[in-house]
């Protein structure tokens, strides 16, 4: 006779605060927040949210958290809501505030871990709406390795100007166009008033929507939950079912790392490549994999990207936004096509307790529409929308969003700036010319600190009509909404003595996308000796912050090639 299989403990940690004589004080505290005698036998579910009133990205999370809690109650659990921070990249762009964007990812992960560990919660539903809050939540889920479900707030609807869709990126580009005399200040004002018609994250395939798509592909979100807009009441249904799902995961004994496996990360990269997603996905997936104890490296992105075509005709480079993806069936449509082509791991487990293939079989999504998302035999590009570069200027790697490139090779003359502001001043003064390579350094994870996004300068370059004629390279990052010829995440960064620290005005820089190379060449005789002379007596710029969160961050953050992690 076989031994009966033991059932998973649905209260793997909350017994520490609910069971036994010694927990009288803890139970007393819990009674004060509404728990009764019968509730102490239920699993306690943390409902962690980055809701705030600062940015439209997160406005719907308060409503969705209520629906999650109803779902937890309906499934037999007890929800306990708590909050964490979120930084709006759109508001913090182009000034000192952007130093704090990437570090917010770590603060979010650390704060969720702190609450979940301290209060002995059994599982979590984690809700987020803005760029860094999505990976921050998923990093926390992987680190804790409890039953966990991620829920996205949803994206905003596009605004309208003269019958044309506009998003927040149009505002950044309008600034450059206005400075170049191409449009009036009144036209900028019209765009400004239209770009955010309501709640939700920025609508293109920028960082938030890329990471929401990744959350679905990696199996941490319910199938079909990434694409519906924030205002769509289907999101309340997904929220309710997410609350039910986490309790079901506890009953099955399924934890985050059983879902966030090597195969799941490869699925996530595949979907990001097919959509032409944000370069920030590279940083965030590397960081998430580290928390999940998955050996993912920057080179895996090229390996997978070689096999996956770029299919999404999506902003910032394409025509469409996430709402259009929703209209054609959402991310399951993309995953089904990729699965049928043998490009995804169908046996990867998901938060439904079923595999990715089982979920897609139940949903039976329609075929690709061949406009918003191209069919595989008619791709926009034959390989994925993100490429990792190496070479003399980036020995550890750099990232380029090839989804927007027409030509595979660009060679130009270096114009070197220590920080974004100096580059913006030069552009406004008309000092940036076609075939220049704008080099912005000391903006890396440690040297920035915080690896600021360069959307203000890239938007201004495009608005000035130089988007296809000027290459911008940096040890900082780019927004998911960045367009133009841009290479970021150059590693080693300048403050660590990477080659970018020794580039000078007049050097020739070549970007060769086809061969995945980023090279620097000193012009003139004795070029090699001149390069070595530049290193003599070199010292990095002094730290900009020595106290506070950025002072601590700069001391411990690792290379962008490893995800800019801090642990």
From Swiss-Prot:
GO molecular function: 2 iron, 2 sulfur cluster binding; dihydroxy-acid dehydratase activity; magnesium ion binding
Enzyme nomenclature, EC number: 4.2.1.9
Highest taxon of the lineage: Bacteria
PROSITE patterns: ILVD_EDD_1 (PS00886), ILVD_EDD_2 (PS00887)
Reaction(s) this enzyme catalyzes, per UniProt: (2R)-2,3-dihydroxy-3-methylbutanoate = 3-methyl-2-oxobutanoate + H2O; (2R,3R)-2,3-dihydroxy-3-methylpentanoate = (S)-3-methyl-2-oxopentanoate + H2O
UniProt entry tagged with the keyword Ribonucleoprotein: no
Keywords (A to Z) from UniProt: 2Fe-2S, Amino-acid biosynthesis, Branched-chain amino acid biosynthesis, Iron, Iron-sulfur, Lyase, Magnesium, Metal-binding
Keyword Calcium: no
Top EC category: lyase
GO biological process: isoleucine biosynthetic process; L-valine biosynthetic process
Homology family: Belongs to the IlvD/Edd family.
The name this protein goes by in its record: Dihydroxy-acid dehydratase
Species classification: Bacteria, Bacillati, Actinomycetota, Actinomycetes, Propionibacteriales
Gene name of this polypeptide: ilvD
